[in-house]
A protein has these predicted regions:
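The feature captures the beta-strand-to-loop junction immediately N-terminal to the Walker
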Residues: 35-37
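Pre-Walker A (P-loop) beta-loop-beta motif of ABC nucleotide-binding domains
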Residues: 22-33
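Helix-to-loop junction immediately C-terminal to a conserved catalytic motif
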Residues: 50
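Conserved ABC transporter NBD signature motif
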Residues: 58-66
Length: 378
């Protein structure tokens, strides 16, 4: 529908920096998520894109046209809010039809278009119902249908699923993606829900303290995070302190064991770093150390099990015996390991376990948090 560019956007509220030097190009038909914790600037960025807030500096470009100073209704954008924002005195049909009526579309044309949209969103049977007669999921579907009815160049979604329950949320995010692909609408989704962003986005923009932390595809953000913030914010991540032995060769050391690890190449020799690995990538070896085959192992005691359905998460505390005599390497306080629930009974709370850490499924990063680990702070 449209190409969107945000160029060096900045925004302050008093002395507080809300958004700092934000630049992003969104391709025609792409769905990009702004993901981050509360207060990171994602909604403010969306509101500046829509025209509800003016940036202190920077520009908003749609298909090569600078719309920074245009009012909201002149930007060819549709917006869906967290709280639905439906007209309570209008039926679902009338809500969806509203934007078309304001634009003076012929009655027959707009009624046909509304009927098509209601079917697209599974609302054909509730078209004559008022908002208070609809469930939360149905109200949000009406809001989505109303937003796309005017065929906007860009669709802006501000936490659209946060007010519905988990089951409906999962259904709606699938519907949003299906609708977005079918209609080809360039879309920005603001969310704090990692699974929501990762499951339906073409790219994810991770935001932190008003700035872009990193941008990538869902797979890149999840499997290859470039910062400790992203690694910790996106799903569960183990952070294992290591020392860079040879940046030239990408070699790190843990308890005297040296391995080649992804991401270590080029890092300064002697620096502390973090070896990042997801709980599902770790492999329990029982109570005896198997052949390492270039990987690391860690010995821990199971503190608690958390049932997650098909998998169970074991929370381990590393045992001091895993350290070499005289090593200055700080221990990993805790480690999360996912195992099939069918076999979780092998490792009850209190049991000792050796875990294989496959370096091929890990990534090394340097970060100030690594320095905190080296001081024993976690």
């Amino acid at each position: 529908m449209a190409r969107l560019e945000l160029n060096k956007i900045n925004k302050r509220f008093g002395d507080q920096v809300a958004v700092a030097d934000f630049s992003l190009a969104v391709a025609d038909g792409e769905l990009v998520s702004f993901l981050g914790p509360s207060g990171c600037g994602k909604t403010t960025t969306l509101r500046m894109t829509a025209g509800f807030e003016l940036p202190d500096s920077g520009s908003v470009i749609v298909d090569g046209v600078d719309v920074t100073d245009l009012p909201t209704n002149k930007r060819a954008m549709g917006m869906v809010f967290q709280g639905y924002a439906l007209f309570p005195n209008m039926t679902a049909i009338e809500n969806v039809e509203f934007g078309l009526a304001v634009r003076g579309r012929p009655v027959a044309e707009r009624r046909a278009q509304v009927a098509e949209l209601l079917e697209l969103f599974g609302l054909g049977h509730v078209g004559g119902s008022y908002p208070h007669q609809l469930s939360g999921g149905q109200q949000q579907r009406v809001a989505l249908a109303r937003a796309v009815a005017v065929k906007p160049g860009v669709l802006l979604l501000d936490e659209p699923l946060s007010a519905v329950d988990a089951k409906v949320r999962e259904e709606l995010r699938t519907e949003i993606r299906r609708m977005q692909v079918q209609l080809g609408i360039t879309t920005i989704l603001v969310t704090h829900d990692q699974s929501e962003a990762l499951s339906i986005s073409d790219r994810v923009v991770v935001m932190n303290r008003g700035s872009i932390e990193e941008i990538g595809t869902p797979t890149q953000i999840y499997a290859e995070p470039r910062s400790a913030f992203t690694a910790g914010f996106i799903g569960a991540m183990n952070e294992i302190p290591v020392r860079i032995v040879s940046g030239a060769n990408g070699i790190v050391e843990r308890w005297g064991r040296r391995v080649t690890a992804p991401g270590a190449a080029g890092l300064p020799d002697g620096d502390m770093a973090l070896l990042l690995v997801r709980p599902e990538s770790l492999e329990p070896l029982g109570t005896t150390k198997a052949a390492l085959n270039g990987d690391l192992t860690l010995t821990g005691r199971v503190e608690v099990q958390t049932f997650l359905g098909a998998t169970t998460r074991l929370l381990l505390r590393e045992l001091p015996g895993g350290a070499d005599e005289g090593s200055a390497m700080p221990p990993t306080q805790r480690l999360a390991v996912d195992v099939p629930s069918s076999s979780a009974g092998q490792w009850p709370a209190g049991s000792e376990i050796v875990v294989r850490i496959p370096v091929t499924a890990s990534r090394v990063i340097t970060d100030r948090s690594a320095e905190r680990h080296s001081r024993g702070v976690h």
